Amino acid sequence: EAEPHSRI
């Protein structure tokens, strides 16, 4: 599953 927030 993809995370709801974007990781930088």
Swiss-Prot record:
One of its GO terms (molecular function) is metal ion binding. Plasma. Also expressed in skin (at protein level). Keywords: Lipid-binding, Metal-binding, Protease inhibitor, Secreted, Serine protease inhibitor. GO terms for cellular component: extracellular region. It is found in: Secreted. Serum albumin, the main protein of plasma, has a good binding capacity for water, Ca(2+), Na(+), K(+), fatty acids, hormones, bilirubin and drugs. Its main function is the regulation of the colloidal osmotic pressure of blood. Inhibits trypsin but has no inhibitory effect on thrombin, chymotrypsin, elastase and subtilisin. Belongs to the ALB/AFP/VDB family. This is Serum albumin. It comes from Duttaphrynus melanostictus.
